[in-house]
């Protein structure tokens, strides 16, 4: 969903393009905490409280504009001449996106994926403790909160659970590290 939208914002001209980009930027200025009460009322009206959707829908609503904004700026750095050469050879816009633009944008896609993942992971705690009171729907960050009692904290168990939750993320970051560095440094030098 983010890739075609970011590509359209980077390459196409359409009505209300700047207005919708400004709206995306405005959405990024608000955190989930500011909109908790309205989100709670909407989710309650839709009957989505105490479900997985109670965490997925607000997270997607906040993170898709972030992903579009970040990826659009990366796609604008890719030379248009490469796409024009593909069009001259008879390629369609979708084929050009898939075979020309996306391979060049892979470092940017990885950076956007990691940024969106970190945002989702951070918001997950807030949305989980607000919109889900059922234990089986609680994600790891909210589950770690269970180790904090009224009088004491069971540090040993909490640290073991935190390490178990962080290890898969660390392994993914280790494998994607070269793409992350390439994507972060791609716009650092002016040519």
Spans of features found by a protein language model:
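A hydrophobic, multi-pass inner-membrane permease signature
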Residues: 1-191
């Amino acid at each position: 969903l983010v890739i075609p939208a970011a590509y359209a914002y980077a390459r196409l001209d359409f009505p209300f393009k700047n207005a919708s980009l400004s709206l995306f930027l405005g959405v990024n200025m608000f955190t989930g905490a500011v909109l908790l009460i309205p989100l709670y009322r909407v989710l309650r009206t839709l009957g989505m409280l105490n479900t997985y959707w109670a965490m997925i829908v607000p997270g997607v609503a906040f993170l898709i504009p972030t992903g579009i904004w970040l990826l659009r700026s990366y796609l604008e750095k890719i030379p248009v001449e490469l796409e024009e050469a593909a069009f001259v050879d008879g390629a369609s816009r979708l084929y050009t996106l898939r075979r020309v633009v996306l391979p060049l944008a892979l470092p940017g896609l990885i950076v956007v994926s990691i940024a969106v993942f970190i945002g989702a992971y951070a918001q997950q705690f807030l949305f989980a403790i607000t919109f889900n009171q059922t234990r089986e729907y609680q994600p790891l960050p909210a589950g770690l909160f269970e180790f904090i009692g009224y009088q004491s904290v069971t540090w040993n168990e909490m640290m073991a659970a935190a390490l178990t939750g962080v290890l898969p993320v660390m392994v993914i970051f280790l494998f994607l590290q070269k793409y992350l560095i390439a994507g972060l440094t791609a716009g650092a030098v002016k040519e």
